[in-house]
Amino acid sequence: KNKFLATLSLTCSISTVSAQTPVYMDDAQPIEARVKDALSRMTLEEKVALCHAQSKFSSAGVPRLGIPELWMSDGPHGVRAEINWNDWGYANWTNDSITAFPALTCLAATWNPDMSAKYGKAIGEEARYREKDVLLGPGVNIYRTPMNGRNFEYMGEDPYLASVMCVPYIQELQKNGVAACVKHYALNNQELWRGHIDVNLSDRVLYEIYLPAFKAAVEEGGA
């Protein structure tokens, strides 16, 4: 009898806890349901705050709902040293140290997906240690002009090579609980006037040259 009562009490306790757990905090629920439930609980101000930065590399959370801030860091070839809250100056922390990895141009030149996996794993470990939620990388824009000062951040002019190399990087990075943010958007292939230029190209060029690496990053890498 006592064993039955103990089991019944435990069952009731578990049921009570389950009933009290909001859908958005229940890992067993579909992600769509969790997002919908979380949004339904937020004020307009809280929703707006989630859509833009609160500092150079962080977005606000919703403390009353237990939703934490989101902390990001550059970049494709190493976690960035900490910078000030509202400007690009370095914070000069005395305990701040990171590894400067070879640029992604060098990684792509190996033609070695296993090396890319090790690269992503190592960066992911450092990002997790630094308590980052999102790493802004890898960079997979295709080389269009040699005058792009950020070409070194990308994986070359071959869409197939970039597609193959970015996937293991992302997979291993994200095993550390750090999300990959692939950059810098498809067709953002030059720095000069990058926020203003009008990109003209055919669908064939888009799908055969500039989009494959981004597609592989999302569909195969899970970014």
Region spans (language model):
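Glycoside hydrolase catalytic-domain context in secreted enzymes
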Residues: 19-223
